[in-house]
Amino acid sequence: PYWYRVDPKSWSPDNPGEYTLERLNSSGSEYISQSGIGRGADNTFYFHGQLNYENTFGEDHGVTAMLMYMQREYRNDVLPNRNQGLSGRLTYAFRQKYLAEFNFGYNGTERLDKGKRFEFFPAMSLGWVVSSEKFWQPLEKYVDYFKVRGSYGLVGSDETGSYDGAAHFLYVNNVNLGGGGSYSTGPTYSSIYKKGPSINSYAVQNAHWERVKKMDIGVDMKLFNQVDITFDYFCDKRDRILMRRASWPALLGYVSATPWSNIGKVENKGIELGVNWKKEVFKGFHVDFRGNFTYTENKYIDKDEPAYPYVWQTETGKPLSRTTGYIAEGLFRSQEEIDDSPAQDGIGSAKLMPGDIKYRDVNGDGKITEDDKVMISPYGTMPRIQYGL
């Protein structure tokens, strides 16, 4: 910053309220900048209170209930992360054969504007222990336990956009007082140099919680009193994902401060299989074998994108971790073939020679550029199949 002192020649005890400031340093700024403050420790404050209820009515009806209040503050930087919420669970079982469960969460976050900080997230699940029915008795020697279940509910997240550079407080502007253009005033030997403000990110006052609509259908069974098998089909539809408005043209002047909005939608679905075999080979000695298998796939349902010139450049409807690249059409056989093919000087630094890879000119403009990249694999770096023993 600039440093000043009172010019002793300009001050008089007869008029002490009038004086002239004399600048001491020749360069500086009219504001004080503050860089990030490093921390060598994290701390968490967590408080929760919980009430539980459990009762059985007669021999057929069982009820349990839980109500919990939670308050959390996590600090690993100058600004802490604060959350508050109320959650509950109610379960009902009829003869331990027909099962129902209702859960809810009423959660709040400081990241959103007033009126949008709290949201309600309910969930419901049903189960049927088929092996408890009388008609199952002939099968008990093969299948000791068989249960079908299903659930559907909403889950919320306030971390939306935080890993992609969104501000902590989404509802306020993030301003850098010295990040804008600059100007100088005054004579050359004592000019005043100033920089204007710049906007790092604009306030998103209508931001909401990110949501996931989760659906699961599963089966639990036990075979020959030794093998436990669990199978699930799941489908998660995530919406209100906070993303920058990529469709807004640069001529609007936002540059790196393009506004954020809850516009993203992603679908993730798949199956999970778990097998556990346990047997007592002889007294005191057990053999335990566990295995699992998971298959998942995902895609963008909706994503705000620029006005790409070619349809193959869009991401909506495609997997998140897909691989893009050029389509290889073989190898160049001669220099004559190189001369007659679309120019691909922009790929690699070496001069093309016979034996180099020949790429397809997808858009037909006579040269190989970034516009010729297409999705060459839907799998990418994230495996769809995972398994373990």
Language-model regions, residue ranges each:
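Solvent-exposed loop/turn elements at secondary-structure boundaries
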Residues: 137-211, 230-266
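Flexible, surface-exposed loop regions and adjacent strand-edge segments
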Residues: 1-9, 78-86, 117-123, 165-175, ...
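Outer-membrane beta-barrel signature, preferentially recognizing the C-terminal barrel domain
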Residues: 79, 177-228, 257-282, 317-324, ...
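Extracytoplasmic loops and strand-loop junctions of Gram-negative outer membrane beta-barrel proteins
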Residues: 28-37, 72-73, 105-109, 130-135, ...
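Surface-exposed, low-complexity loop segments enriched in small/polar and acidic residues
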Residues: 1-48, 60, 64, 74-75, ...
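Conserved small-residue
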Residues: 162-165, 169-171, 181, 280-381
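Surface-exposed extracellular loop regions of Gram-negative outer-membrane beta-barrel proteins
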Residues: 1, 45-72, 81-113, 117-134, ...
